[in-house]
Amino acid sequence: MDWYTGNTTYDTVLTVAFAFAAFVLVGGMFAQSPYGRFASTKVGFNLNPKLGWWLMEIPATVVFAVFYLTGPNRFEPVPLVLAAIWLLHYGNRGWFFPLSIRQVPGKRSSFNVSVMAAGMLVTTLHGYLNGSFFSHDYLNQYGTEWLTDPRFLGGLVVYLGGFTLLVRSEWIVRNLRDKANPGATEYKVPFGGGFKFVTSPAYLGELLAWAGFALLTWNLAGLVIFLITAGNLVPRAFATHKWYREKFADYPTERKALIPYVI
């Protein structure tokens, strides 16, 4: 992967993105982002989770589309394939996932606006860097031969495996709550799929997906989002594992936090 594209604006934004990734990697060692089971309604301003997630993720679709469509190669085969993979991911993360969140009726909003703001910064950077890179092909690497390159093929396999694990794991968690009792607030231990091996298979799937994406696109923008994702999700996975073990006395002892049979 080459560092400089020769486009001053792009290279500057990429540098800023790497600096932000470093901040997330360090910050994640000391605190968890206040959403989900680690959310607090006592500090700061909070939004409805559906709205908060949607606002946080929407730049990944909108900003990506704007800058992708400005590129001269926007209708070339490889950029179109990469854009399709992108839209597959953010069709799920930015649109389907927020709409599918099951919120307890009458429960206070719990999605902290600071999480939304930080997330919007990430998805804006991410959308610009990838949308612009794909359709401008700054490094002249996206000829049709890229579709048979081992980096693309290997990365695609890893990406699809991770994406499948992510979607399946979120489906299992989403269906833990009894539809006949939507007001239930208690947490339950999920079983099946990746939960047989780790506490946070959705996080593992997300990490695998972005690792595969970085490989199949072979650009530094993909590496940035993998680092940011790791900085957020790796420590969160360990905190989640600890939370489950403390809350449920009969929690499966064979489960690891994030990587099957390892940690």
Description of each model-found segment:
Residues M1-F197, L204-I263:
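Membrane-anchoring alpha-helices and their flanking helix-loop junctions
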